[in-house]
Curated annotation (Swiss-Prot):
PANTHER family: 12S RRNA N4-METHYLCYTIDINE METHYLTRANSFERASE, S-ADENOSYL-METHYLTRANSFERASE MRAW. It is found in: Cytoplasm. Keywords: Cytoplasm, Methyltransferase, rRNA processing, S-adenosyl-L-methionine, Transferase. This is Ribosomal RNA small subunit methyltransferase H. The keyword rRNA processing applies. It comes from Albidiferax ferrireducens (strain ATCC BAA-621 / DSM 15236 / T118). Disulfide bonds: none annotated.
Length: 309
């Protein structure tokens, strides 16, 4: 399945609406933009179409398949790094006019059975964004303790049946060996969770939890947001599209935390830690976009601007 980029024009519009950006390269009229989640290149291609001849676009992605897709972009202004977006801090300080983070998993990733992201297809229980590093979900489940499995399902999937699901996974492992396929896990969850949320497969939350955990998605997001403060030039834009409440909560709290002056109660006469971001917008996809692309329904885009401090 081809990937339809969510909030495509809105995100790029927000990224470029920053006339006050003062990146180090601005003396020559050039700006540096970052697509921190290249995916299948939807945002990058539109960003390139909006850039001047001297601007540069740096993309990041952990997925080797994304790098193959990036090879189809023949533009000297574009480069991509086979890294997660937590590596943003490797860019020079105050050098970037705009950072875009699209936290959604791409349709080709979901719909490729070999990647193991979906309960709809028979495939190996992998779920790694970068298949060249780390262990798969199946490998982790083969040795994980019941309490840890339950913690992951509860904390990252917000699943109220986390305990019974974890116990069922371990019981299955002890009786017949570890789970190795997506459909095995989906069926086990369906057999364990006796209530159904309307319109949702009972395995949805468990699959989300394991994917987030095995890729350290929330930890990497926190690192990337912190790095954005370092690399964004004054006036530079931070645009983040999230797809579930855990991600959006982190983004919302980060922007709020850095959008106000902070006083040290232990030193009431000391100067405050001055705000570093200005919250600008919160946007949801239009009804028309959701109708055309149902995977957009949970998306939330937040925009903030780096202040001069």
């Amino acid at each position: 399945m081809t990937h339809t980029t969510v909030l495509l024009n809105e995100a790029v519009d927000a990224l470029f609406c920053n006339p006050d950006a003062t990146a180090d390269a601005s003396a020559t009229g050039a700006q540096v933009y970052v697509d921190a989640t290249f995916g299948r290149g939807g945002h990058s291609r539109l960003i390139l179409s909006r850039m001047t001849p001297t601007d540069r676009l740096i993309a990041f992605d952990k997925d080797a398949e994304a790098l193959v897709e990036a090879g189809n972009i023949h533009d000297s202004r574009f480069s991509i790094r086979h890294q997660g977006f937590s590596h943003l801090d490797e860019l020079p300080p105050a050098s970037v006019a705009g950072v875009l983070l699209d936290l959604g998993i791409s349709s080709p990733q979901i719909d490729n059975p070999a990647r193991g992201f979906s309960f709809r297809f028979e495939g190996p229980l992998d779920m790694r964004m970068d298949t060249t590093r780390g262990i798969s979900v199946a490998q982790w489940l083969a040795n994980a303790e019941t309490e840890k499995i339950a913690e992951v399902i509860r904390d990252y999937g917000e699943e109220r049946f986390a305990g019974p699901i974890a116990k069922a996974i371990v019981a299955r492992r002890q009786e017949r060996g570890p789970i190795s396929s997506t459909t095995e896990l989906a069926q086990l969850v369906a057999d364990t969770v006796k209530t159904r949320e309307p319109g949702q497969n009972p395995a949805t939350r468990t699959f989300q939890a394991f994917r987030i955990f095995i890729n350290a998605e929330l930890e990497e997001l926190q690192q990337a947001l912190a790095a954005s403060l370092l690399v964004l030039a004054p006036g530079g834009r931070l645009v983040v599209i999230s797809f579930h409440s855990l991600e959006d909560r982190i983004v919302k709290q980060f922007i709020a935390q850095h959008s106000r002056d902070v006083y040290d109660r232990r030193a009431p006469f000391a100067p405050p830690k001055v705000m570093q971001l200005k919250a600008l917008a919160r946007l949801r996809p239009s009804a028309a976009e959701v109708s055309a692309n149902p995977r957009a329904r949970s998306a939330i885009m937040r925009v903030a601007q780096r202040t001069a401090s």
